[in-house]
Amino acid sequence: MPVTVAASRLGTAAFDQSPVELRANYSRDDAQTVIRAVYRQVLGNDYVMSSERLTAAESLFTNGFISVRDFVRAVAQSELYKEKFLYNNFQTRVIELNFKHLLGRAPYDEAEVIEHLDRYQNEGFEADINSYIDSAEYTENFGDNIVPYIRSYVVQTGHRTVGFTRMFSLQRGYANSDRAQIAGNASRLAQELARNTTSAVVGPSGVNEGWAFRSAADDYHPGQSLGGSTGLSADDQVVRVEVAALSTPRYPRIRRSSRVFFVPVSRLSQKLQEIQRMGGRVASISPAGQ
């Protein structure tokens, strides 16, 4: 179970569930449940279209020719995985994701990242993936029949505290996708791994935690609405719009992770269009004052 009473607020409550395991004498429905769980975990909850599914590997698994571990391997070494996570990312980001997808945790130190970086450069991507799946850690936690899952939110022998805090930088909520985060393709942990430091726990964005998708030290929180005064009527409501990546010729080019604007609900649609024209990305919308 999650190790904190703030599990629901931090977004870890959804992970308080039994691992998905394929047992003996399984049905076809049981196999499909495992297949869905593998896609969700190994592909970082990214959407998989019907045309992208690994039908050959699914068939081998459903008919008992390969184990859960081998199906995980097939997905992680597939062209689908490479297109989603390898080709468009720096290798440090790829290694972060491999740890999360295959071992269910974040890297503990820079030495782990260097080890996998060397293996990737000298032996190739498939060999590096095999090193996760064939490791003693994978065998001890998942064996041949359990789908990998996020382990950083539970107390286990051999766990380090840094894994708990760092997972909040990699896992941005149960419904979030690893390819749909505000930080994009940037490494989440490279800086703190190099410094041997740990990041503060930052909960996922939500109605009450909208500003939390960036660490507070890097954020800029202006106390004004978008375009000046809100122009409220007596019964109008103001919402808080959190925006990243604003970039226009008339907008100040200052290194800020995000900005917050306060907008009346009656003008929200208009302002969202304006934000889009300014190149911004909306991170969250929540009632003002929360």
UniProtKB/Swiss-Prot annotation:
Record's keyword annotation contains Thylakoid: yes
Cell compartments where the protein resides: Cellular thylakoid membrane
Bilayer topology term: Peripheral membrane protein
Domain of life: Bacteria
Keywords, sorted A to Z: Antenna complex, Membrane, Photosynthesis, Phycobilisome, Thylakoid
One GO term describing the cellular component: phycobilisome
Physiological role: Rod linker protein, associated with phycocyanin. Linker polypeptides determine the state of aggregation and the location of the disk-shaped phycobiliprotein units within the phycobilisome and modulate their spectroscopic properties in order to mediate a directed and optimal energy transfer.
Protein name: Phycobilisome 32.3 kDa linker polypeptide, phycocyanin-associated, rod
Gene name as annotated: cpcC
